[in-house]
């Protein structure tokens, strides 16, 4: 347990909320079961960002699902990371792809998908979806299949 506490700098400590996009707050820890294929899912119902053109707030539920390999994302760091989008100007599709790419850089998962369920503005709701499967593996094929059969 001491080793795990040394790996993580946010959990169990006073929280500083970043006011702009801050991928550096993401932290990972070792997966105790990298030989197993299993889902880890996060549902983040209070995501906010800003429209890069109007500066108006956008609200969404962000859903993150992944098959971990050696590393896993620590949930408090993920919460703080997602909060850092609060004053960040980005289109919905950009937010989803940025989140996915940052998590790939952090963990190098076998497979990951991120969905944004954005609250309607102007009578239109946008639900961007992005996924990734590790190249050259069955997870790459899985990503293609899931993308082609998405909704």
From Swiss-Prot:
In which pathway is this protein known to take part?
tRNA modification; tRNA-queuosine biosynthesis
Q: Which Pfam families match?
A: QueF (PF14489)
Q: Is Cytoplasm given among the entry's keywords?
A: yes
- Quick one: where is this thing mainly located? cytoplasm
Q: Which reaction does it catalyse?
A: 7-aminomethyl-7-carbaguanine + 2 NADP(+) = 7-cyano-7-deazaguanine + 2 NADPH + 3 H(+)
Q: Does the keyword Oxidoreductase apply?
A: yes
User: Alphabetically, which GO biological process terms does the record hold?
Assistant: queuosine biosynthetic process; tRNA modification
**Positions bound to substrate:** 73-75, 92-93
Active-site residues, as the UniProt record annotates them: 51 (thioimide intermediate), 58 (proton donor)
Listed EC numbers: 1.7.1.13
A single Gene Ontology CC term: cytoplasm
Q: Report the record's disulfide bonds.
A: none
Places the protein is found: Cytoplasm
Q: Which GO terms describe its molecular function?
A: preQ1 synthase activity
For this UniProt record, the keywords arranged alphabetically read as follows: Cytoplasm, NADP, Oxidoreductase, Queuosine biosynthesis
Instruction: Provide the family line.
Output: Belongs to the GTP cyclohydrolase I family. QueF type 1 subfamily.
Q: What does this protein do?
A: Catalyzes the NADPH-dependent reduction of 7-cyano-7-deazaguanine (preQ0) to 7-aminomethyl-7-deazaguanine (preQ1).
NCBIfam families with a match to the protein in the record: QueF-II (TIGR03139)
Protein name stated in the entry:
NADPH-dependent 7-cyano-7-deazaguanine reductase
Which species does this protein come from?
Bacteroides fragilis (strain ATCC 25285 / DSM 2151 / CCUG 4856 / JCM 11019 / LMG 10263 / NCTC 9343 / Onslow / VPI 2553 / EN-2)
State which gene encodes it: queF
